[in-house]
UniProtKB/Swiss-Prot annotation:
Primary site of residence: membrane
Residues annotated as transmembrane: 3-23
Record organism: Solanum melongena
Localisation: Membrane
Protein's UniProt keywords contain Cell wall biogenesis/degradation: no
Function: May have a role in maturation, such as during flavor formation or other metabolite production specific to aging tissues.
A GO term for molecular function: iron ion binding
Gene name for this UniProt entry: CYP71A4
Record PROSITE patterns: CYTOCHROME_P450
Matching Gene3D superfamilies: Cytochrome P450 (1.10.630.10)
Protein's UniProt keywords contain Hydrolase: no
UniProt EC number: 1.14.-.-
Keywords, alphabetical: Heme, Iron, Membrane, Metal-binding, Monooxygenase, Oxidoreductase, Transmembrane, Transmembrane helix
Protein name per its UniProtKB record: Cytochrome P450 71A4
Residues bound to heme: 448
Length: 507
C-alpha cells in the first residue's frame, strides 16, 4: 500500500469537505440572513405569536415601523411575511398573484365549511376555480347583483320606517338597525327570505353569529401542531362540532324547503327573483354547468355569503356613520349633495346614486381608515418567489397584507389619520383593488367576488339615511367623544353601540 498516496488522498478529501462545508454555511447564511426579510427576535415554540396582541393590525404596523414594510414573522412553526406597503401588496396580489393564490389550512374553517369547500378558504386548484366561477358568473355577476335591487330598496325602506317609528324615543341605537338591515338583505338574497326563530324554531341569527366568531377564533394547533390536543381541554373542538351540526341542520332545512317549493306545479319564479339557493340547485341539477356541485359545496358557498356579506357590509356602514357623526362638516356636505340630487323626491332609488361623488368619497375614506378586513385572509406561496425583486421567500410561506397600515401610510396619504373625503374627489382610486393604496375587498385571484354587491348596499343605505334624517349625538356628547374603539373579528367592528338622535327631514 502506498501510504503517502493514501494520506494525500485523504488530505484532498478533507480539504474538499471543509470547502463544501464552508460554502454550504456561507450560502445558507446568505440565503437566510441577507435575502430573507428582517425579522423580530422570536421565542422558542411560540415564535412571534406573543407580539400580535389583541389588535394584530396595530401591533404589526408598529413592528413594521421598526423592521420595515416587509418583515418575516414566525407564528409558532409557520413562517409569515407581513406586507405593510403599497409596493409589497402589489407584488403579492398582482405581480406574483399566481404564486400566492392558495390558502393555508385552517382546521376550524375545515370543520365549519365542509372541508373548506367554499370559495374563501378552499385551496387553489381545479375545485376552487370551478366554485369561484359559479359565484362570479351565476351568483354575483353584474346582472345578478342588479336583480337584487328590489330587495335592497325594500329592506332599506323598512329600516327607514323603523327608525322613523323610533324617533319618539330620545336616543336610538343606529348600529342595531344597520345590523338588521344587512342580515335581512343577505338572508333574502342568499336564502330567499328572513328566518324568524318563533317560526322555524331555529335562531338563525345566533347560529350565524357564533359561526363568524368561531371562524375567527385562534386555534393553537394551526400554528403549533403538536399542541392541537389543547383544543379538547378548552372545549373548542366540542363547540366547533356543535355549531357545525346546527349550521348543517339549518341549511338542510332551507334547501329542502326550496326543493319542495320548486316541485309544486303552481310555483313559477322569474330568473330575476331567484335567490342563491335557487341558482345553486339549478347548477346541481346540471342546468347551468357540467360541474358536479355536491350539497356540501352548496352549503359552504351559502356560508361564505354570510361570512363575507353580513359582517363586512354592516361593519362599513357602522364605521361610516360614526365617521360623519364625528365630522359635522362632512355630514352637512354629504346631506347637501344627496338632498340636492334627490330634487325633492320622496324616495331615493339606485338610479339616483350615480352622480353622488361625495357619497362615494365618504365611503372610500371610511374604508381607508377602517377596512372591514384590517388584515386580508392569509395567502400561502406555492413555490419559492422573490419579493420586491430581492427578498427570497420559500414555498409554503404565508403572507399577511396589512390593509389597515397601508391605508394610514404617510408615504401614500397626506395627513393619513384625518377623515377627509375630499382626498377622493377627482382621482381614479376605486374600491375594487385596482389601486393598491385602497384594498377593502382585497385584489387579484383571491379578491372578494362580492364587492359590487356590498358597495350597492352601502351606497343606497347611506344615501337614504342622510336623505331622510338629521342625525345628532345624544345631549352632552361631543363629536370627538364618540367611542371609536375597535373590536377585532372576521371584520374589525366598532366595539360600542352607535347612539344617535334621529330627526325626520321635512325639506
Amino acid at each position: 500500500m502506498d501510504v503517502p498516496c493514501l494520506w494525500y488522498s485523504l488530505l484532498i478529501l478533507l480539504l474538499l469537505f471543509i470547502f463544501l462545508l464552508i460554502h454550504h454555511c456561507f450560502t445558507t447564511s446568505k440565503t437566510q440572513n441577507m435575502f430573507l426579510p428582517p425579522s423580530p427576535r422570536k421565542l422558542p415554540i411560540i415564535g412571534n405569536l406573543h407580539q400580535l396582541g389583541s389588535h394584530p393590525h396595530r401591533s404589526l404596523r408598529k413592528l413594521s415601523q421598526k423592521y420595515g414594510p416587509v418583515m418575516l414573522l414566525h407564528l409558532g412553526s409557520k413562517p409569515v411575511i407581513v406586507a405593510s406597503s403599497v409596493d409589497a401588496a402589489r407584488d403579492i396580489l398582482k405581480t406574483h398573484d399566481h404564486v400566492w393564490a392558495t390558502r393555508p389550512k385552517y382546521s376550524i374553517a375545515d370543520s365549519l365549511l365542509y372541508g373548506s369547500k367554499d370559495v374563501g378558504f378552499s385551496p387553489f386548484g381545479e375545485y376552487w376555480w370551478q366554485v369561484r366561477s359559479i359565484v362570479v358568473l351565476h351568483l354575483l355577476s353584474n346582472k345578478r347583483v342588479q336583480s337584487y335591487r328590489d330587495v335592497r330598496e325594500e329592506e332599506t325602506a323598512n329600516m327607514i320606517e323603523k327608525i322613523r317609528q323610533g324617533c319618539d324615543a330620545s336616543v336610538i341605537n343606529l348600529g342595531e338597525h344597520l345590523c338588521f338591515l344587512t342580515n335581512n338583505i343577505t338572508s333574502r338574497v342568499a336564502l330567499g327570505r328572513t328566518y324568524d326563530e318563533r317560526e322555524s324554531g331555529i335562531d338563525a341569527k345566533d347560529i350565524l353569529e357564533q359561526f363568524l366568531q368561531l371562524l375567527d377564533t385562534f386555534n393553537v394547533g394551526d400554528y403549533i401542531p403538536w399542541l392541537k390536543w389543547v383544543n379538547k381541554i378548552t372545549g373548542l373542538d366540542t363547540k366547533v362540532e356543535k355549531i357545525a351540526k346546527k349550521l348543517d341542520t339549518f341549511l338542510d332545512s332551507v334547501i329542502e324547503e326550496h326543493i319542495i317549493r320548486n316541485k309544486k306545479e303552481e310555483y313559477a319564479i322569474t330568473d330575476e327573483a331567484k335567490d342563491f339557493v335557487d341558482v345553486l340547485l339549478e347548477i346541481q341539477n346540471g342546468k347551468e354547468t357540467d360541474f358536479p356541485l355536491q350539497r356540501d359545496s352548496l352549503k359552504a358557498i351559502l356560508l361564505d355569503a354570510f361570512a363575507a356579506g353580513t359582517d363586512t357590509i354592516y361593519t362599513n356602514l357602522d364605521w361610516t356613520m360614526a365617521d360623519v357623526l364625528r365630522q359635522p362638516r362632512a355630514m352637512k356636505t354629504l346631506q347637501n349633495e344627496v338632498r340636492g340630487l334627490a330634487q325633492g323626491k320622496s324616495e331615493i332609488t339606485e338610479d339616483d346614486l350615480k352622480n353622488m361623488q361625495y357619497l362615494r368619497a365618504v365611503i372610500k375614506e371610511s374604508l381607508r381608515l377602517h377596512p372591514p378586513n384590517s388584515l386580508l385572509v392569509p395567502r400561502e406561496s406555492m413555490e419559492d418567489v422573490k419579493l420586491l425583486g430581492y427578498y427570497h421567500i420559500p414555498a409554503r410561506t404565508q403572507a399577511l397584507i396589512n390593509v389597515w397600515a397601508i391605508g394610514r401610510d404617510p408615504l401614500s396619504w397626506e395627513n393619513p389619520e384625518e377623515f377627509c373625503p375630499e382626498r377622493f374627489l377627482n382621482n381614479d382610486i376605486d374600491m375594487k383593488g385596482l389601486k393598491f393604496e385602497l384594498l377593502p375587498f382585497g385584489s387579484g385571484r383571491r379578491g372578494c367576488p362580492g364587492s359590487s354587491f356590498a358597495i350597492a348596499v352601502i351606497e343606497l343605505a347611506l344615501a337614504r339615511l342622510v336623505h331622510k334624517f338629521n342625525f345628532a349625538l345624544p345631549k352632552g356628547t361631543k363629536p370627538e367623544d364618540l367611542d371609536m374603539t375597535e373590536c377585532t373579528g372576521i371584520a374589525t367592528r366598532r366595539k360600542s353601540p352607535l347612539p344617535v338622535v334621529a330627526t325626520p327631514f321635512s325639506g
